[in-house]
Amino acid sequence: MTKRSTPSSPQSRGSDLKKPGGGWPIPAPGDVLCYAYLWAREAAQGQEEGLKDRPVVVVLAATDTGSGIRVTVAPITHSAPDEPADAVEVPAIVKRDLGLDRERSWIVVTEVNSFLWKGPDLRPLADGSPYYGAIPDWLFVRMREGIGVHAGRGRVRIVGRTE
């Protein structure tokens, strides 16, 4: 049985980012994490580790009986997409609220990484947590719709990460 989590807002996650004993809460769709993302092109070349730690947006966090929590994330990049429909731009105010830089950024909707929580590729920020915060619900919906359109055409590459 799979249990899906729902989008959270930055306000609802802010006070709950660290659990007693140093554990991190299970991420919710829309949460933004620091993660060593492995691009599909890198995985195709045989790489197993992402070359750069970057913000990623949680697309899905699902409980699989016996396996744990499987988390799917989409990368945020400074590179503008070749095709506008391949990414969703992150507004400057959202980047500011997350504590990200001022450069233009996009959420890529044509590929994702999938891993068992808390995989080895999460990267703690200054506060010891990998959480930047969460994107607004309306931006999450745009990202999810973009992924859905590409998935319907068989154009979303899923890179499974080592546990």
Describe the predicted segments one by one.
Residues M1-L17, E83, V90-E163:
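C-terminal terminal-subdomain/extension
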Residues R41:
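Glycine-rich nucleotide phosphate-binding loop and flanking beta-alpha elements
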Residues Q45-D53, V58-R96:
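Compact nucleic-acid interaction/catalytic patches
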